Every structure is written in structure tokens, then in C-alpha cells.
């Protein structure tokens, strides 16, 4: 990994941590609207950005989670699993919006791991918790997609030619 990639991932992690700190009351437990999750869409433009986001998740959970030990395992694990699904699917999907849709669904569905975490740690009902955390994740990722699309046009303009847009 080159210095530029490492520096960029460091900045991504720092932004993730800072945004999570600002919205801390809404970023944990059974009803979550962790706005920093919209950064997950960065992986659509460069797979290596997943490193910065996972580091951000790790440190945000370490610093702010009320159930640190669980969140370091399940929270980070959920991010890694969702990124793996997205990255593998990107081999077959070239359209940026389609990639963002798959990424949104990957993160939404894998919130089942967070529901399991909250059941084990706090005794929350699994299915209801999966529903509420998945809704929060979907809302943040879906509303964040246009913002990250605009950011992506600056980060990876090569992805926005007609071949990748399905035109």
C-alpha cells in the first residue's frame, strides 16, 4: 500500500470517527442512524477505502460504544462481511448506481449480526432489533448515496464514463 492510500484511509477513518462522535446518541443500540455509515459507499469507487472505514468503525466502537467488547467483534465483523459481499459483486457490476444499491443491501441485510450482538449483550429481541437496525442502515445508506455519488465523481472520474453507467 502506498503512502497516498494510507493517508487517504487515515483521513477516512478520522472522518468516520468524528461523525460518529457527533451523532453518538443515534449511532448505537437497537435504533440506529449512524450517519457515518454513508461513507461505506466509498468502497464503490476504490476497494482500498474499505480499510479506512473498517478502522473508523473499530475506533468509533472502541471510543463510544456502550458495549465495547461486543461492538469490536460484531460491529467490525458486520462491516467486513458487507464489504466482502460488495467487493465480490463489483467484479460483475460496473454501473455505479447498481454498485451503490448492492452495497446498501449488503449493509442492510448484514445488520442481522448487529441484532445478534444486541441480543447477546443487552437481551434485545432479535427479529425486532434486526428490523429496526436494518431500517436505520437502509435510510442512511440510501439517503447518503447521492452525496457519495457526487463525491465519487471527484475521486474516481474513470467510473463515470458511458461504459460504467450502462448507457
Locate predicted features:
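Membrane-embedded alpha-helical hairpins and interfacial helices in multi-pass inner-membrane proteins
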Residues: 25-30, 58-167
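Extracytosolic (periplasmic/ER-lumenal) interhelical loops and adjacent juxtamembrane/interface segments
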Residues: 53-57
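Hydrophobic transmembrane alpha-helices
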Residues: 1-51
Amino acid at each position: 500500500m502506498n503512502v497516498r492510500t494510507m493517508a487517504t484511509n487515515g483521513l477516512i477513518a478520522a472522518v468516520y470517527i468524528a461523525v460518529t462522535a457527533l451523532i453518538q446518541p443515534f449511532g448505537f443500540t437497537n435504533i440506529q442512524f449512524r450517519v457515518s455509515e454513508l461513507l461505506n459507499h466509498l468502497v464503490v469507487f476504490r476497494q482500498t477505502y474499505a480499510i479506512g472505514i473498517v478502522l473508523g468503525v473499530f475506533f468509533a466502537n472502541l471510543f463510544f460504544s456502550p458495549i465495547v467488547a461486543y461492538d469490536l467483534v460484531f460491529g467490525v465483523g458486520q462491516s467486513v462481511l458487507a464489504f466482502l459481499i460488495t467487493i465480490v459483486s463489483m467484479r460483475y457490476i460496473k454501473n455505479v448506481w447498481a454498485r451503490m444499491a448492492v452495497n446498501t443491501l449488503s449493509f442492510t441485510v448484514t445488520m442481522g449480526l448487529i441484532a445478534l450482538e444486541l441480543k447477546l449483550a443487552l437481551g434485545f429481541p432479535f427479529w425486532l432489533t434486526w428490523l429496526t437496525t436494518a431500517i436505520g442502515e437502509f435510510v442512511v445508506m440510501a439517503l447518503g448515496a447521492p452525496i457519495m455519488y457526487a463525491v465519487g465523481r471527484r475521486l474516481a472520474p474513470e467510473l463515470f464514463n458511458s461504459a460504467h453507467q450502462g448507457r
